Every structure is written in structure tokens, then in C-alpha cells.
């Protein structure tokens, strides 16, 4: 068979699943995929690779390559590498991203760009799949086209076609080869800012997204639902994926009664069990969202951190949802049985391996509670597998529709956008009775949840604060009862017995109630820290819980000023926003204290739901409105005083709006056009003077 090297760079398993799908399909097209995680550098060597390379690369954080690709990215960015280092290499790359974030698909773009700079050439156009509208809209046609591109590549090696023809489509690389080397990175950053009037590829993406939304809109005109389709889909012949090969053999053994706890959860990072020493409600009871602050006692562990860092919290699934799942799977009487896994001897799955996130010999209840993401939105391959275990012909057909090419719009509307999970499907399709092995094959690892540090170790030695909203999901057509966020709901229940009402954080007492413990682990360090030069002015933009790291910044700066009374410290601006002044103004007293003492130079607060008193000017509704009102000072800080700007909070709307506002401010105040303003902002990002800590 014709061999190609297939590498994936994954953060949460999405890229791995797609790469495995490519590997499975390869055989039927006459190819053999040599599949590896990009971090397994001992198993491949791109410098001597003779076969074509196919890569699937995800994006994490604010446009970073995934953790598994960090070493690879660092190595290929070695400045001593010659420009023909990869001249022998022919590749195709599929990037995964989310257009709700500013730096869409940047993980893939960084690698794609560097491979080009080192002489590699594409045998197949790069794909950019958007999780905002559905990865499969790009992933499926990209995989379909891959086989023809590979066939053409191998034919060209045999002299049947001219290599230049094979590679002609690679000539549309986004960066001009005539561009000066020092401008390459800036130009790349500008491209990734994704303004609507710049970039041919982005316009194509938007057209594709609009087409998809149009498909969904047409469906809404009919009485379709998760369980029911309408013409033309209900009458169409379906193109559905092949049934994923089963590969796990599961045995349930009666337990000997061993004790199980969080420490049994597999983790690649060092983790620590720490007590919660304080819990405070920061919002009033009538606030739209409930926001809590938790204080952790880290005095017994080595856990160094600084303001701007984040850390992971290991959390379980909801007890109620686990119980419902056990009942629905008819396994409630075996909840305490130990789960023993083996690879099926006759499996057709290439490279089948036991899931690393399922510990050996743990109880079924423990695995469903601590190891599997039972809230995960099922991928189409999972739906296809579930259809094979559905006895009702009507229900089976509907599951097949939802995983078919023809049913892509229905999948987006009723599965992905509705955040439907396995339990929802099993309750909606009562004749579906999958074996436990299928769940263990398809449910991903229950991921720890990241939180920003909201305190300084200088102000609170041996303590660690973090802040979160209790995420709540109202009842829906698939979930009859309301649900809370997996981690935030669990934490809220955990601290309910000793939760203190809205109060000044610094004056809150540690309760006498026995403190529950949670497991935390450090995350990779980032650049979201105070400047090394304390005299540099900074602008902080953080509405809602996005203010958390900035409270840590201010605590840290206050202590530094106390320790160095003659030191020179730059101005600190904080743009904060909330809904109501009297309900969810987080850290109000502490922020006023910082303003009074001069640690905080300017505090600009916007209230999106409060009306202006009679006769007064309407207040700014959002943080970007306040930025615009102070555009001269913002521009002077960034462009003349070498200042820094930090943005923390929601990626979907706020971060984009702030980014657009900054471009407008630079354009107006510096008297340059939009493109030049984008270049300036890209330079700030490259210099790590424009930093983001955002989430969706």
C-alpha cells in the first residue's frame, strides 16, 4: 500500500479523532497511514521523511498550538535552520479552530507558515475548520478530497504527471515570498486578525458559514426536531460514515470493596489535594448570575504562582446524571463492579489501544463519575455506532440522518448547537441500547476545568483565590430538568454549607465548618503577567469574572509599592463592566480601596442594564464603550508610552468587540488606515504588549 505520514496535534482529543478517521478511511482508498501524535518525535523524522505528510492541528488558548505540539513548534522555529530544510517535504494540513476567537486556526497556521518558510510544499490545499459553525462542514469535504490529492501525488512520483501540476495549488500561500523576512511574522499576525474586509480565505469562510446558517434557517420553517425529520431529508438517500470498528472488550467483576477517591483519576500533571478555606458569594441573590469566590489553603504543598497564572480543578460529573445513565443502561445493580478492559482479538481498528483516561480495575460508578465526559456532544462517528444498537427502524433512520452528509444542518441545530449529550440521546431514542464498551470507546476524557488566579502570593501567602459564575442551563426539549455547569455546579454544592453572603473579601472569616478538599494542578505558564518593568503603564480590560486576574495584579502591585516606596510605578487603568451596580459589581470595595491608595490610577466601570438617572448622561454600557470614551489616553499609553493592554473574559463577543475598538482607536488617534492599525496591533501582540486570557 502507498504509505503517508499522518500526524495530529491535539489538546482535547478533537484532532486525534479526526486523524483516526483519516487513518480508518485510508485503507479503503488503497493507502496506509503511519499515524502518530506530533509529540512522539521518536517515531518519525521529517528531515528524512520520503512519503507525503498529512497533519491535523488544533488551536488552544488565544491562538496557541496545543500542548502536544509545543516542542515541535519550538524545534521548527530554530533560527539556524536553512530555508531548504524541508524542501523535500510534500504536505497537506487541516487546521481546527473557532472563529469566535480572534486568532482563528492559529495553531495550524503557525505550523503551515513555518513549513513553507523551510521549503516544504503543499500537495493539497490547507483546510481551516470552524467549530463555531461545525467542524464537519470543512473536515468532511477536506478528507473526501484528500484521497484524490494523494493519488495525484503518488502518480507524479511515477512520472505520469508533472510535479509542478501537482503542486500548483500550493502557489496561493498567504505570505509573499518576496516579503522581507522581518515583516513575515507581522504580516501573519495581521492576517489572523480577521477583519471582515481583509483576506480572501476569510470571505470564503464567511460565505460557507452563511450558507450553513441558511440551511438551518430553512429547516426552522418546518416541524423538525431531534427525533423527527422532514422532507427533503426524510426522503433522501443517505451518505453515512462507515460503522467505527469496535475494539474494546469489557468485563465487570464484583468489587472487593476498595476505597476510591479523586487521587485515582489519571493525570499527566502533578496534582494536589487542598482544602477550601473560604467561600464568598460576590453577587446579591437577585443578580442574573451567581458569582462565588473560593479561597484554597495551599500552605501544605509546593504550588508557586503569580497573578495572571491559571490552574486546573479536577471535577466529577453530576451524581444525578451518572445515576440516570446507570439506570438507562440497565447497569445500576453493577455500579460497584470493577471494569476490566481488553483489546478485542479480532478488532479491525488499526493501532487499537486501551483508553489512557480509564484507570484499571476501578468501579463502573467511579469511571462514569470521574473519568468520562458524559456531557460531551456526541460526534457523528458515535451517532453512527449508536444507530447499530437501535432496534426501532424509525429511530435508527433518524440517527443515521443526523450523522449523514445530508443531515449536516440537522446535526448542527439539534445536536451541536443544543449541546445534546449521550444521556439526552438515550432518553430521546428509547430503543437505543448500546453496550458499555461503546461508551468507553467514544466518550472522551473528563477534562479538568481551568480557572484564573485571583490573588497575589505577596498579599495572601499560602492562599489561592479564584472566582467563577455558577453556570446554569434551563430545561430544554431534551433535558427536562435544569442543569448546572459540570465543575461550577459541583463546587457550588460543595461549599453551600459554609458559603458567606456578599461581603468585603478581605474581611470575610474562614468558617468553622469542616472544609471540603478539591484536587488542583498547575497549568503551563503563559505571558499574562505584569510587565517586568514596573514603570510601564498598563490597561486592564475585564468585565464580569474577567476582573479576577486583575485583582491579583493590583494586590501584587500594592505590596510592591509598600516594599519599594521610592520605586517608579506606571499608571494602572482598569475597565470593568457588569450588569447592575448594586447586584454584580464584583470586588467593589477592594477596587475602591486600590483607587483611594493610588495603586489603581483610573477605574472605569460600565453597567449594561442600569438606566441613567434623569438629567444625567447615559453611562457606558460595555467596556469597549468606555475604551472609546478614553481613546486619546488609550492610544497614548500604547503608542507613545510603551504601555501594555490585558484583556480577560468572554471570547464570543467582548474580546472581539474590544479588538475592533482598539483597531478603531489606533486608526483615529494615529491618523492611519485600518490595515495599518491592524499591523500596529499585531506588533503589540508580537511584543507581548497586547495579551489576552479569554474563553468561550
Curated annotation (Swiss-Prot):
Domain FAD-binding FR-type: 269-531
Major site of localization recorded for this protein: cytoplasm
Keyword Flavoprotein carried by entry: yes
Reactions catalysed, as given in the entry: 2 methylcob(III)alamin-[methionine synthase] + 2 S-adenosyl-L-homocysteine + NADP(+) + H(+) = 2 cob(II)alamin-[methionine synthase] + 2 S-adenosyl-L-methionine + NADPH; 2 cob(II)alamin + A + 2 H2O + 2 H(+) = 2 aquacob(III)alamin + AH2
PROSITE patterns: FAD_FR (PS51384), FLAVODOXIN_LIKE (PS50902)
Listed EC numbers: 1.16.1.8
Residues annotated as binding NADP(+): 289, 608-609, 622-624, 657
InterPro entries associated with the record: CysJ-like_FAD-binding (IPR003097), FAD-bd_FR_type (IPR017927), Flavdoxin-like (IPR001094), Flavodoxin/NO_synth (IPR008254), Flavoprot_Pyr_Nucl_cyt_Rdtase (IPR001709), Flavoprotein-like_sf (IPR029039), FNR_nucleotide-bd (IPR039261), NADPH_Cyt_P450_Rdtase_alpha (IPR023173)
Compartment(s) of residence: Cytoplasm
Disruption phenotype annotation: Female mice have more resorptions and more delayed embryos per litter as well as embryonic delays and defects: placentae of mothers are smaller and their embryos are smaller and display myocardial hypoplasia and a higher incidence of ventricular septal defects per litter. Epigenetic transmission of developmental disorders between generations: a hypomorphic mutation disrupts folate metabolism and is associated with effects on offspring development that are transmitted transgenerationally.
CDD domains named in the record: methionine_synthase_red (cd06203)
Biological processes per GO annotation: cobalamin metabolic process; folic acid metabolic process; homocysteine metabolic process; methionine biosynthetic process; protein stabilization; S-adenosylmethionine cycle
Molecular function terms, GO-annotated: [methionine synthase] reductase (NADPH) activity; flavin adenine dinucleotide binding; FMN binding; oxidoreductase activity, acting on metal ions, NAD or NADP as acceptor
Superkingdom assignment: Eukaryota
Record-listed FAD binding positions: 449-452, 485-488, 695
Misc. remarks from the entry: It is debated whether the reduction of free aquacob(II)alamin occurs spontaneously or is enzyme catalyzed.
Subunit structure: Forms a multiprotein complex with MMACHC, MMADHC and MTR.
PANTHER family per UniProt: METHIONINE SYNTHASE REDUCTASE (PTHR19384:SF84), NITRIC OXIDE SYNTHASE-RELATED (PTHR19384)
Protein name as catalogued: Methionine synthase reductase
Organism, as annotated: Mus musculus
Name of the gene this protein is made from: Mtrr
Amino acid at each position: 500500500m502507498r504509505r503517508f505520514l499522518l500526524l495530529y496535534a491535539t489538546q482535547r482529543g478533537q484532532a486525534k479523532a479526526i486523524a483516526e478517521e483519516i487513518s480508518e478511511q485510508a485503507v479503503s482508498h488503497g493507502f496506509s497511514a503511519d499515524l502518530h501524535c506530533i509529540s512522539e518525535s521518536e517515531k518519525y523524522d521529517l528531515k528524512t521523511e520520503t512519503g507525503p505528510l498529512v497533519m491535523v492541528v488544533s488551536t488552544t488558548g488565544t491562538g496557541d498550538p496545543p500542548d502536544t505540539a509545543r516542542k515541535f513548534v519550538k524545534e521548527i522555529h530554530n533560527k539556524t535552520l536553512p530555508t531548504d530544510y524541508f524542501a523535500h517535504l510534500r504536505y497537506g494540513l487541516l487546521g481546527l479552530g473557532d472563529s469566535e476567537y480572534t486568532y482563528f486556526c492559529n495553531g495550524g497556521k503557525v505550523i503551515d507558515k513555518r513549513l513553507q518558510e523551510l521549503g516544504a510544499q503543499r500537495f493539497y490545499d490547507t483546510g481551516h475548520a470552524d467549530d463555531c459553525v461545525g467542524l464537519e462542514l470543512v473536515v468532511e469535504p477536506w478528507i473526501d478530497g484528500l484521497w484524490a490529492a494523494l493519488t495525484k501525488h503518488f502518480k507524479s512520483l511515477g512520472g505520469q504527471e508533472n510535479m509542478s501540476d501537482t503542486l500548483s495549488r500550493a502557489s496561493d500561500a498567504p505570505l509573499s515570498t518576496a516579503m522581507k523576512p522581518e515583516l513575515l511574522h507581522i504580516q501573519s499576525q495581521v492576517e489572523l486578525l480577521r477583519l471582515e474586509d481583509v483576506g480572501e480565505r476569510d470571505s470564503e469562510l464567511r460565505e460557507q458559514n452563511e450558507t450553513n446558517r441558511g440551511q438551518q434557517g430553512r429547516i426552522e420553517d418546518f416541524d423538525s426536531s431531534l427525533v423527527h425529520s422532514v422532507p427533503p431529508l426524510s426522503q433522501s438517500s443517505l451518505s453515512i460514515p462507515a460503522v467505527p470498528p469496535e475494539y474494546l472488550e469489557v468485563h465487570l467483576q464484583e468489587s472487593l470493596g476498595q476505597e476510591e477517591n479523586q487521587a485515582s483519576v489519571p493525570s499527566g500533571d502533578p496534582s494536589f489535594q487542598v482544602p477550601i478555606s473560604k467561600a464568598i458569594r460576590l453577587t446579591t441573590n437577585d443578580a442574573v448570575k451567581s458569582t462565588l469566590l473560593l479561597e484554597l489553603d495551599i500552605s501544605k504543598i509546593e504550588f508557586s504562582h503569580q497573578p495572571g497564572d491559571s490552574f486546573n480543578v479536577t471535577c466529577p460529573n453530576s451524581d444525578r446524571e451518572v445515576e440516570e445513565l446507570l439506570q438507562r443502561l440497565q447497569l445500576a445493580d453493577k455500579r460497584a463492579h470493577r471494569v476490566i478492559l481488553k483489546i478485542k482479538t479480532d478488532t479491525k481498528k488499526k493501532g487499537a489501544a486501551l483508553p489512557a483516561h480509564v484507570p484499571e480495575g476501578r468501579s463502573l460508578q467511579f469511571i462514569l463519575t470521574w473519568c468520562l465526559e458524559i456531557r460531551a456532544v456526541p460526534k457523528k462517528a458515535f451517532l453512527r455506532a449508536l444507530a447499530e444498537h437501535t432496534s426501532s427502524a424509525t429511530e435508527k433512520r433518524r440517527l443515521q440522518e443526523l450523522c449523514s452528509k445530508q443531515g449536516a444542518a440537522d446535526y448542527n441545530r439539534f445536536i451541536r448547537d443544543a449541546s445534546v449529550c449521550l444521556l439526552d440521546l438515550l432518553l430521546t431514542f428509547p430503543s437505543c441500547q448500546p453496550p458499555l464498551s461503546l461508551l468507553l470507546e467514544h466518550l472522551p476524557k473528563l477534562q479538568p476545568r481551568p480557572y484564573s488566579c485571583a490573588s497575589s502570593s505577596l498579599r495572601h501567602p499560602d492562599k489561592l483565590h479564584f472566582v467563577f459564575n455558577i453556570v446554569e442551563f434551563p430545561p430544554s426539549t431534551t433535558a427536562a430538568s435544569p442543569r448546572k455547569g459540570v465543575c461550577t455546579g459541583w463546587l457550588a454544592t460543595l461549599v453551600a454549607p459554609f458559603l458567606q453572603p456578599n461581603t468585603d473579601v478581605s474581611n470575610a472569616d474562614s468558617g468553622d465548618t469542616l472544609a471540603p478538599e478539591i484536587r488542583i494542578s498547575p497549568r503551563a505558564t503563559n505571558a499574562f503577567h505584569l510587565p517586568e518593568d514596573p514603570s510601564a503603564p498598563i490597561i486592564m480590560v475585564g468585565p464580569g469574572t474577567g476582573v479576577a486576574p486583575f485583582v491579583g495584579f493590583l494586590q501584587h502591585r500594592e505590596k510592591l509599592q509598600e516594599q519599594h516606596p521610592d520605586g517608579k510605578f506606571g499608571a494602572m487603568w482598569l475597565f470593568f463592566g457588569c450588569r447592575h451596580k448594586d447586584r454584580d459589581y464584583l470586588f467593589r470595595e477592594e477596587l475602591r480601596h486600590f483607587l483611594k491608595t493610588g495603586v489603581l490610577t483610573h477605574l472605569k466601570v460600565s453597567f449594561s442594564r442600569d438606566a441613567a438617572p434623569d438629567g444625567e448622561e447615559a453611562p457606558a454600557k460595555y467596556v469597549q464603550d468606555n475604551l472609546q470614551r478614553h481613546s486619546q489616553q488609550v492610544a497614548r499609553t500604547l503608542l507613545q508610552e510603551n504601555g501594555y493592554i490585558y484583556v480577560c473574559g468572554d471570547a464570543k463577543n467582548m474580546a472581539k468587540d474590544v479588538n475592533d475598538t482598539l483597531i478603531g482607536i489606533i486608526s483615529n488617534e494615529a491618523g492611519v488606515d485600518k490595515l495599518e492599525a491592524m499591523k500596529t496591533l499585531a506588533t503589540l501582540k508580537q511584543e507581548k504588549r497586547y495579551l489576552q486570557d479569554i474563553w468561550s
